[in-house]
Amino acid sequence: MEQYQAYLELRRSRYQDILYPLFFRESIYGLAYAHESFFIENVDYNNKFSLLIVKRLSTRMYQQTHFILFVNDSKKNTFVGYNYHFFSQIILEGFGIVVEILFSLQLFSSSLRGLEIVKSYKNFQSIHSIFPFFEDQLIYLNHKSDIRIPYPIHLEILVQILRYSIKDVSFFHLIRLFFYYYYNWNSLFPPKKWIFTFFSKRNRRIFLFLYNLYVWEYESIFLFLRNKSSQLQLKHFRVFFERIFFYEKIKHLVEVSTKNCSYTFFFFKDTFIHYVRYQGKSILVLKNTPFLINKWKYYFIYLWQCHFDIWAGLETIYINELSQYSFHFLGYFLSIPLNLSVVRSQMLQNSFLIKIVIKKLDTIVPIIPLMRSLAKTKFCNVMGHPISKPVWANLSDFDIIDRFLRICRNFSHYYNGSAKKKSFYQIKYILRFSCIKTLARKHKSTVRIYLKKLSSEKLLEEFFTEEDLFSLIFPRTSFTLRRFYRGRIWYLDILLRNDFVNYL
């Protein structure tokens, strides 16, 4: 227990005066100048949430002698003669900016030490980096746990988590004051999903910060338990650490193996745990016995209930065998089928038939959900037949073709890593004919007449390569095309999901 407390203390910072940058101009501009987003794009927010406006309003509040907040009657709340709701929203957004700057600077200074690590981290920012990792590791594992991360139903839990890192009493008094205004803090059971609607519509930046802080705290404890469950403890933990620090781990492995045992592979017989988080959910993939997997399940439940005071039932975590289970992940449909191969072995006068089971990760384009998303965006009907986009009919021909090509190109880059290309080409076919029907609608003509006037081959080449066309028409004609049909190309410069995936 003492080792666990010491571990958490090392990961937590101690900011004594969090309000200081808001009241003293010299400090806030230094922080704003040094602040850059190294990991994700900055969250968009309105220009009215500028630091200069926040500082001026904070100065007015600081100079105000009579400032009374009526908890039960928010209409009486005024701020320097103006509406309290507008100014409290701006100041609360300013708090989110300042705290985000401080924590991002701490994260950069503690996690990325040296230029080489920064370059390595940026090389694995792509959302597609997880799929080659799955291809390398997932086939050797046997169980998968779907974890739905519970969210605190009361704001006090989030504030208590924030108090672990910040020791500024005035900051918590003021942030509680704003929360009192938006909602009755004393209510024991707030409405369902109230926290999400409160933050996502009014204070998106402070919501993302508090949520990420809560997840960071939960994953820090999980990392501690994960390292303690393995005999070969990790020296570093970053995104895709298996690849970034591969050579350093090999050196460390050799040192450990020569001192403690005679067999190097002894360490690889221990627990294999891989963790991925996305969209408020997480995937825990293990190579373990059912007993140890259920043990991890109760670890998570007790962690949420005892440490965060959040109720989490057994239905929060589902455990499945990978060989008998398929799942959706980031717009792909993943499965690990068992391919049975029979090998004949000849030994002198006897021959033997040996059955070998080979696992392979299949990344399939979910054709039906994608057609539904295309139908919602008016590219096709419910049956999957292409239709025109009347909203774009008033644009020029160049703009119409450019928009469709951009959508088709983004779709191709995102789904080029699919194992089977037929569904992939069907979606591109829908986009192509939707473009042709939109152009024909604009020129008040039919598709056949419009294609006769326009060079159809040129438009066809814009949407498909030569291999695409042959694979769509003759999917299994030659060995070369069959190799292309099965090939996968992962684009490692994609930071966001495809737009169609948002509708899945």
Swiss-Prot record:
Q: A Gene Ontology CC term for this entry? A: chloroplast
**Keywords, alphabetical:** Chloroplast, mRNA processing, Plastid, RNA-binding, tRNA processing
InterPro entries noted in UniProt: Domain_X (IPR024937), Maturase_MatK (IPR002866), Maturase_MatK_N (IPR024942)
Please verify whether the record's keywords include Transcription regulation. Answer: no
Is Signal among this UniProt entry's keywords? no
Q: Name one GO biological process term.
A: tRNA processing
Q: One MF term from GO for this chain?
A: RNA binding
Pfam families with a match to the protein in the record: Intron_maturas2, MatK_N
Localized where?
Plastid, Chloroplast
Function description: Usually encoded in the trnK tRNA gene intron. Probably assists in splicing its own and other chloroplast group II introns.
Family per similarity comment: Belongs to the intron maturase 2 family. MatK subfamily.
- HAMAP family from the UniProt entry: MatK
Q: What is the recorded name of this protein?
A: Maturase K
